[in-house]
């Protein structure tokens, strides 16, 4: 039976050595997580599985005695990675629920955020329909923060088989992620990407400066659709401007589909009881069969570096995790399988104030996306079309979209390449 619990008692509910899975992003139940961290010394061997972290809850300087794991170093999880404090599971986001449902990762406690019941409808998952649900089905103990300021979302209805053991009540603004500031480089990339996308296409993109710039650049398009893992404020802008109608989607017609809402109060107001917005689990947002069935799916992802053959590293820089496998491969392959779909890797040509080329002869980190899946690579300098091209032509096309000061060096490297 579900019972109210005071946050002061959290350390008495969590056993030594427990693995606690917590909601991610804006769906982090901060009333619970912040108190758990405050009480961390009362629970020896405390382990936390976190996702995309937007809050400051898990700052490395305030989490001594706690070990962390995640599927990437996204958001503020990168602080833990930089400090050598997080163990990474290199898993496709679409397969992440299976880590828990198949017993590869065994959760003891799950802490999640819910929206209260409204007008006879049950509680809602609110801001995230994700792997936390699968973890909760396997956990010994499930504790919910029922937050009055969390939007009630369709598709996010609390599953009837999900047991909530304890809950706390909260009334606080969920963790916010404001739209990113975009500079001239991001705007140049966005202009090139927008020119590739036809009216009526269905868009997948992430969060951050380049995705936000691309969504802004799509402001003159018509009848676009959205099917994405993450949805932010810029998607709400396009819906309210009449650019996104979802009217030409071949799957989930009329619905903006996503798994996570990462934005501000403006996005939360847009999402609350919006029948045209549907939150779905990773099996739907990232499922291979679902994505392949969406005609004209344009998947837009980014990279830390791309080599001359089209291999993508979206995980590490200088041997430190700063990204993750995430949903990139799910969407790259889904878009390639979509009728009329395209996969786009959009990134600046350089890093570190222009001192390092992101287009490289050989990756310095892991291969996240294979060259056999490569389609379009876009930088501020141009568009490299790699699909259907042999290696020598790929190298020439990639060099052409590199920053000019690095092209000669890349050409020399390409001349000596055998594979």
Can you name each region flagged by the protein language model?
Residues 1-419:
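Conserved alpha/beta enzyme-core scaffold
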